[in-house]
């Protein structure tokens, strides 16, 4: 952790004139505490993180502004069992497959959202079937990774509940100009 704290985590985002500006990494607990008005979308990338992440969310009273997801069904299932529905979770690949092939069936799901890529390997993923599945099952729909105004337009026209982006300032400017 000491070594990570030395790295300038924001250097790629600064103008040349601001290269001496320093942005360090923060722990999840610090981020949830410092940015206590922001919503967080957390992805369990490694096994064994579910309990740690759950405890941090509880300690920082961030239950109502955090969504936890994972591409790994087992990691997600572990978190769902721990949180007992107290913290929003997004489906894994498994639920996205169900949505694609059985879009009109009501399911007994233990998740509250689905996340899907805008385009995957050149194919449009967000579809009417996916939107219908989310509506039938009372799920939020979040699309990732959307980085330009044209695609922001498409997501909003489509009725997405959330947009994940690598360009948060660009998205904020777009939303301010188009709301």
Language-model-derived ranges and their functions:
Residues 26-27, 76, 94-103:
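Alpha-helical scaffolding within the catalytic cores
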Residues 47-48, 96, 170:
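Solvent-exposed loop/turn segments at secondary-structure junctions
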């Amino acid at each position: 952790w000491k070594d990570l704290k030395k790295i300038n985590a924001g250097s790629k985002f600064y103008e040349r004139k601001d290269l001496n500006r320093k942005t360090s990494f923060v722990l999840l607990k610090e981020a949830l505490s410092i940015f206590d008005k922001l919503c967080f979308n957390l992805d369990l990338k490694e096994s064994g993180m579910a309990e740690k992440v759950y405890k941090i969310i509880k300690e920082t009273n961030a239950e109502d502004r955090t969504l936890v997801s994972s591409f790994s069904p087992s990691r997600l299932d572990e978190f769902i069992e721990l949180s007992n529905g107290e913290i929003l979770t997004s489906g894994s690949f498994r639920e996205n497959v169900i949505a694609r092939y059985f879009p009109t069936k009501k399911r007994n799901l233990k998740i509250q959202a689905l996340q899907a890529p805008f385009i995957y390997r050149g194919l449009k993923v967000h579809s009417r079937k996916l939107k219908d599945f989310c509506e039938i099952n009372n799920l939020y729909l979040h699309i990732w990774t959307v980085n330009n105004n044209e695609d922001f337009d498409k997501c909003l026209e489509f009725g997405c509940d959330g947009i994940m982006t690598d360009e948060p300032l660009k998205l904020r400017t777009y939303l301010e100009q188009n709301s």
